[in-house]
Design a protein with these regions (language model features):
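Nudix hydrolase/Nudix homology domain
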Residues: 30-31, 77, 93-132
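Conserved Nudix-box catalytic region and its N-terminal flanking loop in Nudix hydrolases
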Residues: 16-54, 58
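Conserved hydrophobic "DFG−1" position in protein kinase catalytic cores
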Residues: 10-11, 19, 86-88, 104
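Short helix-loop capping/hinge motifs at secondary-structure junctions, enriched
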Residues: 16, 91-94
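A short coil-to-beta-strand element that immediately follows conserved catalytic motifs
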Residues: 59-67
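Active-site-adjacent beta-strand/loop module that shapes the phosphate/pyrophosphate-binding cleft
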Residues: 69-92, 103
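Conserved N-terminal beta-strand and adjoining loop/helix that marks the start
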Residues: 1-17, 37, 68
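A structural signal for short, well-ordered beta-strand segments
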Residues: 8, 65, 83-84
Length: 132
């Protein structure tokens, strides 16, 4: 079974990436971009906005598709994750929903923190990370 998911790649004015620490499986304890499963009938854009608001307290404007990855899940599930660039339009970062923590991360953090599998490689391959 394929499960459609979305994620948001959000940078601040200092080129730091917004990451959340997953509070529940899959990926509990790992840092990732905000995102999750689409609700039935929900568009990608609406899903990105909802997930970011639920997990971080931030309102966003959704930009272009950065890339897509397939991730295996339990019981033969495949998570099809479409990650979009987004910009903050309102709110103050605060962990919520299934996020245990939320923070702006620089390049050093991306190397040091335990990230979701393939996150750094995907962001690099898609060319969305700011220069060192």
């Amino acid at each position: 079974m394929r499960v459609n998911c979305v994620g948001a790649i959000i940078f601040d004015a200092s080129d730091r990436l917004l990451l959340i620490k997953r509070g529940h499986p899959p990926g509990m304890g790992l840092w990732s971009v905000p995102g999750g499963r689409l609700e039935p009938g929900e568009t990608d854009e609406a899903g990105v906005c909802r997930e970011v608001l639920e997990e971080t307290g931030l309102e966003v404007e959704v930009g272009r598709l950065a890339g897509t990855v397939d991730r295996p899940g339990p019981g033969g599930v495949t998570y099809v994750i479409r990650d979009y660039l987004a910009t903050v339009s309102g709110g103050v970062p605060a962990a919520g929903d299934d996020a245990a923590d939320v923070r702006w991360c620089d390049r050093a953090d991306l190397v040091r923190l335990p990230l979701s599998e393939g996150l750094l490689e995907s962001l690099t391959a898609w060319g969305v990370l700011p220069p060192n």
